[in-house]
Every structure is written in structure tokens, then in C-alpha cells.
Amino acid sequence: MYVLGLMSGTSADGVDAVLVDFRGNLNKPRWKLLNSVSLKYSVDLQKAIIDAGQGSKLSGCDWLELSEAITEAHFSAASRCDPDGISTVVGCHGQTVCHRPPKPSFRGASWQLIQAPLLATLLGKNVIYDFRSKDLALGGQGAPLAPFLDYALIGRGKTWRGVLNLGGIANLSLIPPLKGPHRKCHLLGWDCGPANTLIDLAVQKITNGQMNFDCDGLMASKGKPDLDAIKKWLKEDFFQQPPPKSTGREYFGSLDLAKRFSEINSANVNDLVATITCFTACVVAQDLNNLFKKSWIKPAELFVAGGGSRNIFLMKEITNRSPGIRVLSTEKIGIPSQSREAMAFALLAWWNINQKPINTNVTGLKEPSVLGIAVRP
């Protein structure tokens, strides 16, 4: 079955679209990536999305116009990715503007802006969307969902395999080995903490909006990280919390960045970016080290995807802080680093059409469930 997958992540920089052919066993499908397209949001649309996610007061009409603009961008990306219209169904994540993980005192919830009926009508295809709500309603974190793609498409090997996504948020998947004492272990996955969310905000603030991100990590490479500040940050509650856990821009946004800037013992702009970038690497390394201490689980390979995989400074920091782990791009296994999450929602749409439930181990939902809501054109 030809499936379109559409994803716009926490960085809110645009829409990634993929066209994938899935066939065979639902648990271990044969697959082929036929096309991929990345469409950038306009500067104004990106700013509107980020402001909305950080508490900007909007009227009902403002929300309506924002969701329409996001839907039109998704339609454009889908049309470019599948110009001949060969796809049968579309898996669309939408644009997250609020993700609230569950706590003992309140129910979890997540809101992705997209007008799915409009998108289905424009494309003339069934659209599967709202993948997180059912998971949250059943007590799960609602995120991350991409680990299910890693398990199905990358698969198991002789040792534990890790997949790290460096989008707006850094999240990990750990795939158990085929043999050995850990062969009966479950797939693991969780959000580690901020990645491009804080790094991009830092660059935008320092350059007064003249730059949107640190290309290749050049600014960070010229600076010196404040390791004392990072050591303090790693003791915060979220980073001490065991999986399953999830987070978003609501926690790691402009206010959080301002607080961290005030705690860095340097006013040098390159030092500021280096510290925020190194913080992401330390968050990931701490999670991997804690897991090894508690469960003797350590991946031999760590495949990295997302925009952060192109940040040379960040990749070096992760490699240096993860001894004994081979760090490489998902490109090495045929999954473009920018396409992984869009492929995940294509897979979830295919599973929805075939009524395949996901398991409970990654997000913590109480029972297996089919994720997503279907809308016809």
C-alpha cells in the first residue's frame, strides 16, 4: 500500500512529507521510501506557531486562521511528494501547540493543529490524524511514537540498537537484541529533553532574528560550554525522572531559555550557544548512562535522525560523551534523517487502516490500542 506521511515537529520549521510503500507482515513489513519532500514554513507562520505554543493570547478567529495556514502547508507538501496521487491513505501528525504529559493530579492531553477534513478534501484521500489523544486517554504519555517505526523498520540485531531523534525535543528508542539475556526485553522509548527547541531559540535571540539556527554548529564550536551550569541543570526533576516520560516546548521554551542564560557564567554569545548545545548532549548521555547502571542495557550503535544530526558540534559532543557506542546517521540504514518521523506517521496510518494496535511499553498506556482517527474526503 502506498502511504503518505506528513510531520511538522516541535521546531515548527516546516512540513516533512514522505511517500512509502508498505507491504507484507504488519509487524515487520517490507518497505520502500519512494519520495521525500521538506517544505519550509514562512517566517511569519513559524513565529505564529511558536508564539501560540508559548502562551500567546489568540482569538478564536486567530486559531482558525492558524490551523488553516498549517493545513494549506501540509497540502502543498503532500502534493509535491505525491504529484501523481498514487497514495491510498495519508498519515498526518499536525502541528503540536500544546503537549501536557499526565501527572497524578491531572489527565494528560495533547493538541495538534490541523483541519483534517479540509486536508482530506483537498487531497481527495482518507486522512488519519490525532494519533496521540487515544494513548493519553488510556494513561500513556502520548509520546514518543516514532520508536514503533524503529522496531518495525530497523529491527533487532545482535546487540541493543539505539535510535536518537534530535528534533525540537531529543527522544530515544532502544531496540532489544535477538539473542542473549535481553532478548525478551520490550522496546523502550522516551523523551530525553530539549534539543533544537532551545538551541534555535538561543541563536534567534542572540542574533535578533537574523539567524534561525546554528548551521553545522559553527557558533557552538567557537564557544566554551559552562559545564557547572549544565551539571546543575541535569539535577532538575524531569531529567531525574525514569521513563516513560515526554515533554515539549511548553517546558523548554523562551522562558526556560531566559532562565538558563541567566545561570551561564559567560556573556560571550558563542559560549551561550555552546552551553545550550552541550546541554542536549549531556541530557542524552545521562539517560544512556542511567539505563546502563540500572539495567545493564547499552546500545552498540546509536542511529541519529532529525535536524540536530546535521549539527557537527552536537554530534561530536554526543559521541564523546557516549564511550563504547558507535554514533552514526540513520542515512546509513536507508532512512533520511529528516524523514524518520514522517515515515513513522505513514506507518501508524497503515496500521490504523489494518486495525493493528500498538503495545503499551513505550508510552505507558494501559492497554494496546489502535491510534489515530480516520477522515474521508
Swiss-Prot record:
It comes from the Bacteria. It comes from Prochlorococcus marinus (strain SARG / CCMP1375 / SS120). The gene is anmK. This is Anhydro-N-acetylmuramic acid kinase. Pathway: Amino-sugar metabolism; 1,6-anhydro-N-acetylmuramate degradation; Cell wall biogenesis; peptidoglycan recycling. Belongs to the anhydro-N-acetylmuramic acid kinase family. Keywords: ATP-binding, Carbohydrate metabolism, Kinase, Nucleotide-binding, Transferase. PANTHER family: ANHYDRO-N-ACETYLMURAMIC ACID KINASE. Catalyzes the specific phosphorylation of 1,6-anhydro-N-acetylmuramic acid (anhMurNAc) with the simultaneous cleavage of the 1,6-anhydro ring, generating MurNAc-6-P. Is required for the utilization of anhMurNAc either imported from the medium or derived from its own cell wall murein, and thus plays a role in cell wall recycling. Its EC number is 2.7.1.170. InterPro entries: Anhydro_N_Ac-Mur_kinase, ATPase_NBD.
